[in-house]
């Protein structure tokens, strides 16, 4: 008889514990109802990248002195620098510069150590393609600047909708 009463008490305690845990979970759910969603509908809405974001590398052909510092500091020796030596002026002349973004790890060492600042990081992050050979950018493709992300219409829509929701 006492065993049955003890089992019934244990069962009652377990029911109260379960109800307490369910209540705690429900409180967390109610707390999150007032918050803004974290996700966006990506192709149609885009988030503004942070200031420290390291996107595609931009290259300025005229500033490059073909010193190959970018190749030496790259962990995977990725940038391909082709140059010829001009004997009359005793200087290197850059012929070709390319980076394969299918292999690049976007560490930013090349940008940081470039003595002439001919390399810079952009806000562009949409580099996907169906053919990996399309990710090999030469100096012409690297020289094209993408439109600033802050001027993108889909980002402006997200920022405006969030500001109107907070008011």
UniProtKB/Swiss-Prot annotation:
<comment type="function">
    <text>NDH shuttles electrons from NAD(P)H:plastoquinone, via FMN and iron-sulfur (Fe-S) centers, to quinones in the photosynthetic chain and possibly in a chloroplast respiratory chain. The immediate electron acceptor for the enzyme in this species is believed to be plastoquinone. Couples the redox reaction to proton translocation, and thus conserves the redox energy in a proton gradient.</text>
</comment>
<feature type="binding site">
    <location>
        <position position="107"/>
    </location>
    <ligand>
        <name>[4Fe-4S] cluster 2</name>
    </ligand>
</feature>
<keyword id="KW-0677">Repeat</keyword>
<comment type="subunit">
    <text>NDH is composed of at least 16 different subunits, 5 of which are encoded in the nucleus.</text>
</comment>
<keyword id="KW-0472">Membrane</keyword>
<protein>
    <recommendedName>
        <fullName>NAD(P)H-quinone oxidoreductase subunit I, chloroplastic</fullName>
        <ecNumber>7.1.1.-</ecNumber>
    </recommendedName>
</protein>
<feature type="binding site">
    <location>
        <position position="64"/>
    </location>
    <ligand>
        <name>[4Fe-4S] cluster 1</name>
    </ligand>
</feature>
<dbReference type="InterPro" id="IPR004497">
    <property type="entry name" value="NDHI"/>
</dbReference>
<dbReference type="Pfam" id="PF12838">
    <property type="entry name" value="Fer4_7"/>
</dbReference>
<feature type="binding site">
    <location>
        <position position="74"/>
    </location>
    <ligand>
        <name>[4Fe-4S] cluster 2</name>
    </ligand>
</feature>
<comment type="similarity">
    <text>Belongs to the complex I 23 kDa subunit family.</text>
</comment>
<dbReference type="InterPro" id="IPR017900">
    <property type="entry name" value="4Fe4S_Fe_S_CS"/>
</dbReference>
<keyword id="KW-0934">Plastid</keyword>
<dbReference type="GO" id="GO:0019684">
    <property type="term" value="P:photosynthesis, light reaction"/>
</dbReference>
<keyword id="KW-0004">4Fe-4S</keyword>
<dbReference type="GO" id="GO:0051539">
    <property type="term" value="F:4 iron, 4 sulfur cluster binding"/>
</dbReference>
<keyword id="KW-0479">Metal-binding</keyword>
<feature type="binding site">
    <location>
        <position position="114"/>
    </location>
    <ligand>
        <name>[4Fe-4S] cluster 1</name>
    </ligand>
</feature>
<feature type="binding site">
    <location>
        <position position="110"/>
    </location>
    <ligand>
        <name>[4Fe-4S] cluster 2</name>
    </ligand>
</feature>
<keyword id="KW-0874">Quinone</keyword>
<keyword id="KW-0411">Iron-sulfur</keyword>
<keyword id="KW-0793">Thylakoid</keyword>
<feature type="domain" description="4Fe-4S ferredoxin-type 2">
    <location>
        <begin position="95"/>
        <end position="124"/>
    </location>
</feature>
<dbReference type="GO" id="GO:0048038">
    <property type="term" value="F:quinone binding"/>
</dbReference>
<keyword id="KW-1278">Translocase</keyword>
<keyword id="KW-0520">NAD</keyword>
<keyword id="KW-0618">Plastoquinone</keyword>
<dbReference type="GO" id="GO:0005506">
    <property type="term" value="F:iron ion binding"/>
</dbReference>
<feature type="domain" description="4Fe-4S ferredoxin-type 1">
    <location>
        <begin position="55"/>
        <end position="84"/>
    </location>
</feature>
<dbReference type="InterPro" id="IPR017896">
    <property type="entry name" value="4Fe4S_Fe-S-bd"/>
</dbReference>
<keyword id="KW-0521">NADP</keyword>
<keyword id="KW-0150">Chloroplast</keyword>
<dbReference type="GO" id="GO:0009535">
    <property type="term" value="C:chloroplast thylakoid membrane"/>
</dbReference>
<dbReference type="InterPro" id="IPR010226">
    <property type="entry name" value="NADH_quinone_OxRdtase_chainI"/>
</dbReference>
<feature type="binding site">
    <location>
        <position position="70"/>
    </location>
    <ligand>
        <name>[4Fe-4S] cluster 1</name>
    </ligand>
</feature>
<dbReference type="GO" id="GO:0008137">
    <property type="term" value="F:NADH dehydrogenase (ubiquinone) activity"/>
</dbReference>
<feature type="binding site">
    <location>
        <position position="67"/>
    </location>
    <ligand>
        <name>[4Fe-4S] cluster 1</name>
    </ligand>
</feature>
<feature type="binding site">
    <location>
        <position position="104"/>
    </location>
    <ligand>
        <name>[4Fe-4S] cluster 2</name>
    </ligand>
</feature>
<keyword id="KW-0408">Iron</keyword>
């Amino acid at each position: 008889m006492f065993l049955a009463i003890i089992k019934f008490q244990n069962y009652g305690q377990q029911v109260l514990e379960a109800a307490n845990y369910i209540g705690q979970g429900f409180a967390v759910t109610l707390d999150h109802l007032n918050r803004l969603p974290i996700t966006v509908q990506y192709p149609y809405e885009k988030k503004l990248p942070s200031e420290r974001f390291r996107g595609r590398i931009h290259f300025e052909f005229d500033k490059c002195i073909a010193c190959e510092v970018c190749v030496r500091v790259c962990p995977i020796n990725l940038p391909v620098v082709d140059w010829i030596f001009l004997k009359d002026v005793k200087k290197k002349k850059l012929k070709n510069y390319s980076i394969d973004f299918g292999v690049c790890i976007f560490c930013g060492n090349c940008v940081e150590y470039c003595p002439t600042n001919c390399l810079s990081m952009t806000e562009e992050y949409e580099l996907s393609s169906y053919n990996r050979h399309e990710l090999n950018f030469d100096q012409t493709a690297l020289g094209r600047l993408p439109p600033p992300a802050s001027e993108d219409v889909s980002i402006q829509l997200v920022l405006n909708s969030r500001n109107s929701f907070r008011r």
